[in-house]
Swiss-Prot record:
Disulfide-bond pairs as recorded: none
Entry binding sites for substrate: 144, 366-367, 399
Lineage: Eukaryota, Viridiplantae, Streptophyta, Embryophyta, Tracheophyta
UniProt organism field: Nicotiana tabacum
PANTHER family: PYRUVATE KINASE
SUPFAM superfamilies according to UniProt: Phosphoenolpyruvate/pyruvate domain, PK beta-barrel domain-like, PK C-terminal domain-like
Name of the protein this chain belongs to: Pyruvate kinase isozyme A, chloroplastic
Residues reported in the UniProt entry to bind ATP: 146-149
Enzyme's top EC category: transferase
Domain of life per record: Eukaryota
Example GO biological process: glycolytic process
Length: 593
């Protein structure tokens, strides 16, 4: 079967001429591709018309419902997600842009804007409003709250401060909530922020409960069968091997352990135990991925309107699918995305299926490195990043990026090289954990991520300019292939023509995500009518998300956008722009008037 590719060339002196070229169809039978060259406007327009549904259909609104028992049995009304749509009374002629993005663009120009996104875990060191503001000013795109630590009341306070920060200071910081997961981990250390385990010390790991403070050199464990499952001679790894113990004696619910590798014990650190050089996995495999506490935390996240829920220790795609159905049932118009944390052998065994089912993935290298040989972690990281790129899922590289900066004001050179490699692999985002949650230098750590990202991105663009990045087709994942073809073509045109920016007008973010996947040389200005979509796009590589009211009239949208951005000094007359849209499924090339 073949399908026509029509070229319409118009000028002011005569009627359009039409050229028809038959070729094997790359589009569904419901659509066609038109290339229009408007000489008088210096505008090249490529349009693909299709009967496929546009992603601009308005979702049906419904109240947010949460489970009171964490299992979905009893439902009650909860607070509507904040900022899902434009606030009532918002001026339709205005445009909302992150203040840091605007400043970066004005200061550095199109080519030198940062493309890699930055995530900060919020903890005692960064939970104040002024501290959050400094992180946002330093380039934080997403704030992460970890339900392993703190109470829901504390996390609600942080979320409220982040909302206030966005509303009052002009930021678009998204919120990501991590579930605790059902893996075996330590308790809270009796309220202490940390404890130092020295070489040769004897520590007691127990399932008994104690009122603070804990007895000296005692650690509680969350798994009741811990003392029964471990054996004398087993090796116990804390927090991915940051501290190591050898089991030397079992006395009822207590397990006596000898410290063989000293280090810092942190509250609720993950525990794994090895026997004869192999990870003991049987007990962990029997634990559910999402615990009863996790379900209550998820209900909390839905009620508070978080943008992302990151699921710990995902074992299969079915877990992700179940959670997405759960969220949809309780908030039908919810924009919450589900991120799969890849941090176990089970995750690696079902990697592609898990990523396909999710809305993104996190390479949690710390816990992953506790279950596979250390030398295997870099290759697995690269594999995960590549699969996410192929399947058009944002990917976060996390854990121990700048671990030394928890205590020191500058990173090791090896850490800088590690960050550089993550940027070079073109992951969407880098994440700080303990560095920002409890470290002494959270702002400096963020500055390091930002500066290294900028340098490596600039170097990569200079070395790889005009290089065509071939990606496998993902059209089978969507209802049609037109959007993918348009975005691939637009990105290649942008590189070849050395345009200043790509504009994309999108309701649900799909077209913007496809453009981000192509990793073009220029920045991508993503315009959406929905505040929650704007925040969600803040996770993806190269996207500068704006909230803007627009119509189906692309000429009107472009004129309006040009006027608003020129008034803010973000673009100027003569800048070369390529614009795509999911309304008309078109490509337009033009100079800013």
């Amino acid at each position: 079967m073949s399908q026509a590719l029509n070229f319409f060339v118009s000028s002011s002196s005569r009627s359009p001429a039409t050229f028809t070229i038959s070729r094997p169809s790359v589009f569904p039978s419901t659509g066609s591709l038109r290339l229009l060259v408007k000489k008088s406007l210096r505008t090249l327009v490529v349009e693909a018309s299709s009967a496929a549904a546009s992603d601009l259909d308005e979702p049906q609104s419904s109240p947010v419902l949460v489970s009171e028992n964490g299992s979905g049995g009893v439902l009650s009304s909860a607070t509507q997600e904040y900022g899902r749509n434009a606030a009532p009374g918002t001026d339709s002629s205005s445009i909302e842009v992150d203040t840091v993005t605007e400043a970066e663009l004005k200061e550095n120009g199109f080519r030198s804007t940062r493309r890699t996104k930055l995530i900060c875990t919020i903890g005692p060191a960064t939970c104040g409003f002024e501290q959050l503001e400094r992180l946002a000013e330093g380039g934080m795109n997403v704030a992460r709250i970890n339900m392993c630590h703190g109470t829901r009341e504390w996390h609600r306070m942080v979320i409220e401060r982040l909302r206030r920060l966005n509303e009052e200071k002009g930021f678009a910081v998204a919120i990501m909530m991590d579930t605790e997961g059902s893996e075996i981990h330590m308790g809270d250390l009796g309220g202490a922020s940390s404890a130092k385990a020295e070489d040769g010390e004897i520590w007691n790991f127990t399932v008994r409960s104690f009122d603070p403070p804990l007895p000296e050199r005692t650690v509680t464990v969350n798994y009741d069968g811990f003392a029964e499952d471990v054996k004398v001679g087993d090796e116990l790894l804390v927090d991915g091997g940051m501290v190591r113990f050898e089991v030397i004696e079992k006395i009822g619910p207590d397990v006596k352990c000898l410290c063989t590798d000293p280090g810092l014990l942190l509250p609720r650190a993950n525990l794994t135990f090895w026997r004869d050089g192999k990870l003991v996995r049987e007990r962990n495999a029997m634990l559910p991925t999402i615990s009863s506490k996790d379900w209550l935390d998820i209900d909390f996240g839905i009620a508070e309107g978080v943008d992302f829920i990151a699921v710990s220790f995902v074992k299969s795609a079915e877990v992700i699918k179940h959670l997405k159905s759960y969220i949809q049932a309780r908030a039908r118009d919810s924009d919450i995305s589900v991120i799969a944390k890849i941090e176990s052998i089970d995750s690696l065994k079902n990697l592609e299926e898990i990523i396909q089912a999710s809305d993104g993935a996190m390479v949690a290298r710390g816990d992953l490195g506790a279950q596979i040989p250390l030398e295997q972690v870099p290759s697995e990281q690269q594999k995960i990043v590549q699969i996410c790129r192929q399947l058009n899922r944002p990917v976060i590289v996390a854990s121990q990026l700048l671990e030394s900066m928890i205590e020191y004001p500058i990173p090791t050179r090896a850490e800088v090289a590690d960050v550089s490699e993550a940027v070079r692999q073109r992951g969407d985002a880098l994440m700080l954990s303990g560095e920002s949650a409890m470290g002494q230098f959270p702002e400096k750590a963020l500055t390091v991520l930002r500066s290294v990202s900028l340098r490596i991105e600039r170097m990569w663009r200079e070395q790889k300019r005009h290089e065509v990045i071939e990606l496998p087709s993902i059209a089978s994942s969507f209802s049609d292939s037109i959007s993918e073809e348009i975005c691939n073509s637009a990105a290649k045109m942008a590189n070849n023509l050395e345009v200043d920016a790509l504009f994309v007008y999108t309701k649900n973010g799909h077209m913007a995500s496809l453009l981000s996947r192509c990793r073009p040389d220029c920045p991508i200005f993503a315009f959406t009518t929905t505040t929650s979509v704007r925040r969600r796009l803040n996770l993806q590589w190269g996207l500068m998300p704006f909230r803007l009211s627009f119509s189906d009239d692309m000429e009107s949208n472009l004129n309006k956008t040009f006027s608003l951005l020129k008034a803010r000094g973000m673009i100027k007359s003569g800048d070369l722009i390529i614009a795509v849209s999911d309304m008309l499924q078109s490509i337009q090339v033009m100079n800013v008037p």
